[in-house]
């Protein structure tokens, strides 16, 4: 209480002092700081127990009062004097001319008395935060600021991270308000000259004439990676604000010339290496919720917690890298992306992805899936997808597999290990959800653009209705459809409005998929209505995803190509997997059908024609999704003759799957589960055909 009263009285006295007395008071307090070093020989006394902290606070209070007093005089005086606002008072002039900041920086480096560095950091922080006039363009200010930033790596004395962050945050706040000042913090001191105004043009000239210092970014990134969660988050936010505000050519050039992108990538690689080899791949993909803004404390008690904490730190840094790219200038974003590609993708991840050990494959695939799940910045997505799949735009040929990495990732969807196949299929499911065309075009679209899957003699000008009924007659003659289109009890919506809005032929597309599985081997009498709502939601999401891709609204390509049709490596593997649905594990079947259903909902006319139109006439040697399903159903019909009571077994297996239990051991369980998945997949495709060719999809 008495201390506050004394401070109040002293402030009241100081407000009545004339300018000359204010300067004398400022000089007196500064001499009080220097006098300590002349009179005191006790080197063990901490700085906080001396009068140095109090005198430094008095210096700041005097400077703040002087500035506010000059501002009030300006507002009440002649407003035409535009230069008066930038005129420094006598106390500020004394601070600049007598190099007080340089002296304080020297005392901080010496760390005498103990804790002096913290006091100097606080003084700088308060000076930059409380004094409103620009200061960083002065040589006698930005040079000691540079030196104080560089002290972060000085082993002499232990700099408190809290005070250091407070100082760096104050510097970043000034840079955020005026990014042209960045040149005075990053430039080399040997070529610096005093400037009274940090204009944008001067900043750009300096940026090109001086090699940037690295201390600011190194200090910030060191705090960004510390174990104190709150300090870590504040440091990341400070760096993010600087990059977000630096949009002019000069600051952008300085940042690109700095080693910021290198430091970011190096820490990403370091965190990747810290992920224990013992961590299970499922734990990597299961960690869905991460946020770099949340505290990441270091309280870990056992090995498992250490592994999870290491993984979380890595994924949080991945998210932060994505945020840096999104918020930075385009040139800076491309530089960070390039560094991540060269340092992390090519240097760390690619060698792991190409390993042959099953555990290594599972681990690297899970990490890649988790990383891609967290990327939203366009430069990062494009760089990653181009790195994985290349930039070829022409159709694939059967003998050419492309890059080794692309070929390996696709082929692993059909790996001997079901676990690797599942992980690879989930990776591609993640990739297909990305708002970039690169992957989908490389995997599927480029092979369908010429429509060479169509027979050369097919009349493409005929209407949908004629095409539909001709195809229906062909199906009726198929030996696997001896009953034609049996009455399944399934009916499309029959309201007049719905009937008038559906294009001709859509109903026959739907019926074709619903009629694929014979009644004798069905395990459910429910229709495809349960899939319609999900199909509508997913179709709208797909339309939104591809809205900016410039896809055609109608099929293009003649269908007459001299080159043999090849569906591409990816579709070859998927259709091959679908062909083995009766002999594969249940989880693999679910993942394969999920991927194909997702592809069928993309609003590309050629893709929908190839996957959803049962009535196209295929070129010799070509296959479509429907033709593969016909063969699978034929195989199922043949096998059903050798399995007694198959329909009862199918009903029992369906109940077990719905209950997620397997209490009763059954024969032919893989076959029965495959048949159930096949039946439901046909319903999914029927819903997709209905939604994609009907206004209900919108």
From Swiss-Prot:
Query: Could you tell me which InterPro entries the record lists for this protein?
Result: FHIP, FHIP_C, FHIP_KELAA_motif
User: In which family does this protein belong, per the annotation?
Assistant: Belongs to the FHIP family.
**The protein's name:** FHF complex subunit HOOK-interacting protein 2B
In the UniProt record, the gene name given for this protein reads fhip2b
